[in-house]
Amino acid sequence: MDWLRTKRIRAKKRKRNVKENGEVVLKELIECCDGKCNPIKNFSYDQIIKATNNFCQSNRASRIDVYYRCYKGMLDDRPVLIKKGKYTLDMKEICRDIAISSMVSGHKNFLKLLGCCLEFTPPVLVFEYAEVITLGPLLTSHPGYLRRIKIAREVANALTYLHTAFSRVFIHSNLDPFTIFLDGNGVAKLGNFCNCITIPEGETFVHDDTLQKYHELRHNTLKGTHGLGVCNLPVIDPDYKSTGKVTTKTDMHSFGGFMLALVQIREVDDELSLSSDMLRALADLFIKPYDDVRYVHFPLHHHVSKILRKFGYAEVVDSDMSEVAAWPIKAFLRLALRCIGCKLGDPLSSMIQVTKELRLIEKSAYYPSNNRSQMSSI
C-alpha cells in the first residue's frame, strides 16, 4: 500500500503546483499585458511524461541553454519542443517567459508557445518544434550570405515588434545565438523571455540588475565549452555597464554583436591573444573583463575597429563570404559596427531603423546590379 500512498502524495503535490504556479503566471500576464493574451493550453503531467519518454536522455535536443533542458516530443500528433526549467530559474522568470511568449506567439518571427504544464516545479513549456535547434550548427556549416542577411533581418523584425507593438516597451535583454531558433523553412524565431525587461509607459529607460545576473550565470554555464562555432554572446551594452540603465539600445548593442557572429569574424592576430573564433574571443574580453585586467576599459567596438583597420575586411570576414558578396556584406558589417557603437555615419536611433537598413541590404544582395546605389543610402 506504500505505492498507493506515494501516488496520492505526488498527485496532491502536483495539484498544489498548479494552483501556486497558476497564480504567478496570472500575475505576470496582468503585469505584462493587462491579462490580454493568446489562450494558453495546459498540458497534463502524464502527457508531458509520455511525450518525452519520462525526459529520457535520447529525447534531449542538442543545444546549450542557461535556464532550460530541451526535449523533442510528440503532442496532439505534432512534433513539439518541450523546455523543462532548471533549478537556477526562479518562478517569476519562467512565468514571465510564459506570459510574453503567449503575447508574441502570433508573430512569425517568435517561437510559438503551444502551452505549458504547471504540475511541474518549475513549470514545463511546450513550443512549436524547430528542426534546426540553434544557430550554432548553422554557423559552422557556412551558409550563403543571403541566408545570413535574411536571418538577421528576421531577428531585427522580432526585436522591433517587442519594442513597438505594445503600450509598454519590452527589452529582450539576452539576445544571443542560443535564443534564436530556425523552423523547417529556415525562418528565424526569437525565444526565451526569462530576462525580458519592461520599460514603463512614457519612460525611455529603467534601472535593472537582471542582465548582470544573467551574464554571470551564462559564463558559468559555458565555461569549458569549446567548438561551438559561435561567439560567446550576448554582448553587454557599455552604457548599461556604466549606468545600469536598460533602454532599446541595450538590445541594439547585443544585436550588433549577433550580426558580427553571423559573418563569423575570425582570428588573424595572435598578438591580441584571441581564440580560434575571433568574435567569441572579443565578446569574452568584453563580457568578462575580470579575466584580464588589460581589457577592463576596452569596449568591443574598439577591438573590432582596430582589427578591421589593421587587416581589412577580407581578412576578418568568413572566407566563404568575402569574395561573393563584397557590397552587401560590407554594408552588413558596417551596420553591425554602428549597432555596437562605432561612429560610422549617422547614429542609429532604434531597431526600426536597423530593420529598414537590413531590408535595403537584403534587397541589394538579391539585385547586385543596384548594389552601389543601394549602399550609398546606408
UniProtKB/Swiss-Prot annotation:
Binding of ATP, residues: 40-48, 83
Induction: Induced by elevated temperature (e.g. at 25 degrees Celsius).
Single Gene Ontology BP annotation: response to temperature stimulus
Superkingdom of the source species: Eukaryota
Keywords: ATP-binding, Nucleotide-binding
Ranges where the Protein kinase domain occurs: 34-378
GO molecular function, one term: ATP binding
Family label: Belongs to the protein kinase superfamily. Ser/Thr protein kinase family. ZRK subfamily.
Subunit structure: Interacts with RPP13L4/ZAR1.
Note on domains (UniProt): The protein kinase domain is predicted to be catalytically inactive.
Protein name: Non-functional pseudokinase ZRK6
Organism: Arabidopsis thaliana (Mouse-ear cress)
Organism taxonomic ancestry: Eukaryota, Viridiplantae, Streptophyta, Embryophyta, Tracheophyta
Gene: ZRK6
